[in-house]
Amino acid sequence: MQKFAFKSLFAVALIFGFSGFGWPKAVDFGEMAYRTSCADCHGIDGKGNGPMAARFKAKPTDLTVEAKNNNGEFPFEAVYDIIDGRKPIAASNPRHMTIWGQAFLSFGPDSQGIPRNRISAIIDYLKRIQAK
């Protein structure tokens, strides 16, 4: 019986292996949080070309060159402070980003780790999409 089960499992694995079937990609929480909170303005690729970008006086920042514009170092704290609403952004663009600072902090006083983790995950994703 065990041989039959093993052979059946092996046959199924072969069929799926050669049919293009694959396991779903692991969920990337940072990418998911970026897409739901940032991509409308900054674009899926982070280059400032999202569907809402045309509504602003100034084009949203190209997030793929943050490290390049900072001598090769990704400015973690500065980006964090912008996302959570503490650091002002370009004067030509009203503070539309404050909406996300408030949204991330709206989880309540007992859940301080949730917004920090979400912002950190977004920043981790941004670090991975930096232009080389």
Give a label for each model feature.
Residues 1-4:
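N-terminal secretory signal peptides that target proteins for export/translocation
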Residues 8-19:
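Bacterial N-terminal signal peptides
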Residues 56-117, 122, 126:
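Extracytoplasmic electron-transfer domains, predominantly the class I c-type cytochrome c fold
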Residues 25-26, 31-58, 72-73, 84-95, ...:
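Periplasmic/extracellular electron-transfer cofactor-ligation site
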Residues 14, 41-42, 108:
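Amphipathic alpha-helical interaction segments
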Residues 16, 29, 111-114:
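Alpha-helix capping and helix-coil boundary motifs
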